[in-house]
Amino acid sequence: MKVLITGGTGFIGSALTRSLTEQGFDVTVLSRYPDAVEKICGPGVNALNNLNQLKPEDTYQVIINLAGAPIFDAHWSDARKQVIRDSRISLTKKLVACMARMTVKPELLISGSAIGYYGDQGDVVLTEQSVTRADF
């Protein structure tokens, strides 16, 4: 199975990429640092540095979108929150546009984001329909 991961060299993405390749998946990582993909994610991972490298005839059964500005490296000022938000929204829109041009559409798109959007709600199970909080 072919899997495309955006943000595959990040905190979550690198662990996921290693796990998937160990299970035999054919993984391609979109990263700002394509030369570092093998070092960070392990051998056998394909690397792209731009969505424009995706061709309409490329086929991926699964696309996992984890890309975005890091959340651990700076205080969350209003300006930083805007960077975090914009980096995720912009890339997601571009990714969906690329998917629309694909001859064979992926069977599954998984798009991750920070749980901070929902705030700390204890042991409550959170879904897309959950009420957001002003924590972020």
What are these regions (language model features)?
Residues 27:
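Short beta-strand element of Class I
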Residues 30-34:
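N-terminal Rossmann-fold cofactor-binding loop
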Residues 93-135:
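Conserved Rossmann-fold NAD(P)-dependent oxidoreductase catalytic core, especially the SDR/UDP-sugar
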